[in-house]
Amino acid sequence: MLINFLRLLPPETAHQITLKLLKSNFKIYRNKTQQFKTLKQTILGIDFPNPLGLAAGFDKNAEVIKSMLSFGFGFVEVGTITPKPQKGNQKPRIFRLIEDEAVINHLGFNNDGCEKILKNLKSFYKNDNYAGVVGINIGKNKSTQNDIDDYLYCIEKLGSYGNYITINISSPNTPGLRDLQLRGRIETLIKKIQNKQNEIKQIINKPIFIKISPDLNDEQLRDIALMSLANNVKGLIISN
């Protein structure tokens, strides 16, 4: 009934209502989660109960981490988070593809910004019963004067509140973001991020992943692969 009702609404409205219901502890039906030892795996020191996780984009503001973990996800990645709050692109910006059972989004990193989301993360970790892997996905503001500084700011503010950090340079919806994937620029970004990481005791050993776009050409992929190997990048999140 609820799902059918939500499908009658504009997709972004349906998403917002779902988040409000989850925040209010509304008893949305959930399967009783079962753990299977064969699905457990440890990657870069992180113990994942299973490999199926919730990607960034659903819980942009870290409001419903506990609820989503209770559905059985092996991890939840929040964000993308930018230093300052921003509204994102003009609506409508989410479109249903009924026949493909999919959606297209043109959101543009809409989120509440570091300061407010930091409070949400602190609130989540106050619960002694929390369990699960949390990733922090960070990006740059649309109007920033220095994109690299945006990433460094987010890492300093939020890095200690996730099991891993994702550097999002993949979105086509933020002007200039994908330019950070270009040879030279991406290496400068990574080196500055690693320097910042080494300055902060709480995150010095946390994995940092780079999220790249799905439509890079072969030369670009080769450049990123070689740069990643040369700079000991822990991993890539491939496709948006």
Region locations from a protein language model:
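An N-cap/entry alpha-helix motif that binds or orients negatively charged groups
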Residues: M1-Q41, N105, N110, C114
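A gly/proline- and charged-residue-enriched helix-loop-helix capping module
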Residues: G79-Y130
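Conserved alpha/beta-domain cores
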Residues: F48, A56-D59, N110-K126, Y130-N240
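Short, conserved acidic/polar surface loops in the N-terminal third of protein domains
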Residues: V64-M68, Q86-R93, N146-I148
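Active-site cofactor/substrate anionic-group-binding motifs, chiefly glycine-
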Residues: F48, G57, V64-K84
